[in-house]
Design a protein with these regions (language model features):
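Juxtamembrane/disordered regions of integral membrane proteins
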Residues: 12-321
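N-terminal amphipathic/basic-hydrophobic helices that include classical n-h-c signal peptides
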Residues: 1-15
Length: 323
């Protein structure tokens, strides 16, 4: 009997520890859910009184309540994943993730809002408020999430970390490659997914049949020569937002690529499931959601592939030789 009780006790203790751990994580995510909801609503209050009043939006894919639930869950999941997979801790982690989150979720998206919608549905006053809207979730929620998830203490990392360490020449050609890749994904997804929607073409002032791809591209370069340089700038901002994630990641490059892909695609596009007077046509929102979620996810994964370490040769880059 004594032997049985000795072998049984560790199993019971392990089971109890597992139950305690489960409820601890449930309580943590419940707290994070509540905090993000409150701060998201606080940020949204910046738009009070400046949204278009003469534009009626078509209904979203889901109700406002369900949409808010989805937005909160998606953002909490992505931010928590970035925090928990980082080798960093304390303010280094909080500031790094906060800046990356604001840059990728608010800044890089709203400069595109300025470029395309400032002459359609977005006033200069509203544009400023859109930039302010993202501040609470980035610079208040992220540090709080670091604390709630138990990463508030700085821990010195003595393990080797080759992420982002490469010669200047390699940085130059990789950033050039990243820019070309982003232009290809942006323009390809934009034309073959979003631009095939006649309601979207009409919304942006080009009703009727779509032009063939190369004619459409040439016409865009002729009439809007700033578009491609502007998108190259956005590509570099995307990369800047990915650097703290790549450098701080303690998981393997495949998982890091998945995380950055989700980070680039989920928080920015989940809002398209709701009604939106800035994009009042439901099919336009859906087209943009599919277009940008697909292209930015792929782009995020490629950024990690190119930048996570130095590559000695093209074979090394393609995984055909040992690093």
């Amino acid at each position: 009997m004594a032997i049985r009780s000795k072998t049984k006790y560790p199993k019971e203790k392990k089971r109890m520890n597992a139950i305690k751990s489960f409820f601890k994580w449930i309580s943590r995510f419940t707290i994070l859910f509540f905090l993000f909801t409150v701060l998201f609503i606080v940020g949204s209050m910046a738009l009070t009184g400046v949204m278009p009043v003469n534009t009626t939006s078509e209904p979203g894919l889901v109700s406002e309540t369900s949409g808010l639930l989805a937005i909160v869950l998606a953002n909490v999941f992505v931010i928590s994943a970035l925090i928990l997979t980082s080798r960093w801790g304390g303010w280094k982690l909080a500031i790094g993730i906060a800046l990356a989150y604001y840059g990728a979720v608010t800044f890089v998206m709203q400069i595109e809002t300025w470029y395309f919608l400032s002459s359609i549905t977005v006033s200069s006053q509203l544009l400023l408020r859109l930039f302010l809207m993202g501040i609470p979730t980035a610079f208040l929620f992220v540090p709080l999430a670091v604390w709630v998830l138990g990463k508030s203490r700085y821990t010195a990392d003595t393990s080797s970390n080759s992420a982002l360490i490469m010669p200047v020449q390699q940085w130059v050609w990789k950033l050039s490659g990243v820019s070309v890749v982003y232009l290809g994904l942006y323009w390809g997804a934009g034309y073959f997914i979003a631009w095939q929607n006649p309601e979207l073409r009409a919304f942006y002032g080009q009703p009727g049949e779509s032009l063939p791809f190369f004619i459409h591209t040439a016409k865009t370069i002729l009439h809007d020569p700033a578009l491609f340089p502007f998108q190259i700038l956005r590509a570099l901002i995307w990369v800047l937002c990915a650097l703290p994630i790549i450098r701080g990641s303690k998981v393997n490059p495949w998982w890091t690529a998945l995380l950055v892909g989700m980070f680039f695609s989920v928080p920015q596009n989940i809002g398209h499931i709701l009604a939106n007077p800035l994009l009042p046509i439901a099919s336009v929102r859906l087209s943009h959601m599919i277009e940008t979620a697909a292209s930015t996810f792929i782009f995020g994964a490629i950024v990690v592939w190119l930048l996570h370490r130095e590559h000695k040769t093209v074979k090394d880059l393609l995984g055909l030789s040992q690093p």
